[in-house]
Amino acid sequence: MAQQSLYFQTKLEDKVSLLPSQMVGNMENYLLENLEAKVKDKVTEHGIVLKVNRIIEYDYGIISKNNFSGTAIYRVKYECLICSPVKNLSIICLVENIVKGYIIAKNGPVIVAIPFNNIDSDKFQLTNGNIVYKNNSNNIQKGDYVKVSIINIKTNLNEKKITTIAKLLDMATNDEIKSYDNDQLLIVNGDVDDEQEFI
């Protein structure tokens, strides 16, 4: 099944360290705290983890014989809200800037660069260095909402943003703008209504 949304709930697995002083009665709280410090708001191999909702399970933990500090490594399965752009995914973005040859837009932690030569020519035209929407002859400008299709993704582990290259498809409809606003609330609140899971 193809991914249909930029934001979704999923289950992931990671290794989490606990110091000997954290291996006490509320160990699960320390596991959650250390897990969040490791993955929250950072680029991982799966995307950006926006919120760790809960720990599903964890193993007994392993202390390496070469580890003289007594730190144990636990394999933790957890449920989280993730932001994961993929190729050919259509998303709504807010135009933040227009620089020579590019529209720079954003959706949450995803920065979108749209080259002027990568626009839907049925809906837009390049006139005097501006991209003009053919339906109303207005120039694309800062503050506009646009619909794009992701072409390429650049990530660096542990960074807070994902950079993408996209094709400009259309101006966003009112319903799409409302959906974009809901996504921005989702980023802040960390809750999601649907139960989509991509594992």
Curated annotation (Swiss-Prot):
Keywords carried by this UniProt record: DNA-directed RNA polymerase, Nucleotidyltransferase, Transcription, Transferase, Virion
Phosphoprotein in keyword set: no
Catalytic activity reported: RNA(n) + a ribonucleoside 5'-triphosphate = RNA(n+1) + diphosphate
Protein location: Virion
Pfam annotation, one family: SHS2_Rpb7-N
GO biological process: DNA-templated transcription
Record keyword Transferase present: yes
Native organism: Acanthamoeba polyphaga mimivirus
Principal place of residence: virion
Enzyme Commission identifier(s): 2.7.7.6
Top-level EC class as recorded in UniProt: transferase
Superkingdom as given in the UniProt entry: Viruses
GO cellular component: DNA-directed RNA polymerase complex; virion component
An example molecular function term from Gene Ontology annotations: DNA-directed RNA polymerase activity
Family classification: Belongs to the eukaryotic RPB7/RPC8 RNA polymerase subunit family.
InterPro entries with a match to the protein in the record: NA-bd_OB-fold (IPR012340), RNA_pol_Rpb7-like_N_sf (IPR036898), Rpb7-like_N (IPR005576)
Name of this protein: Putative DNA-directed RNA polymerase subunit L376
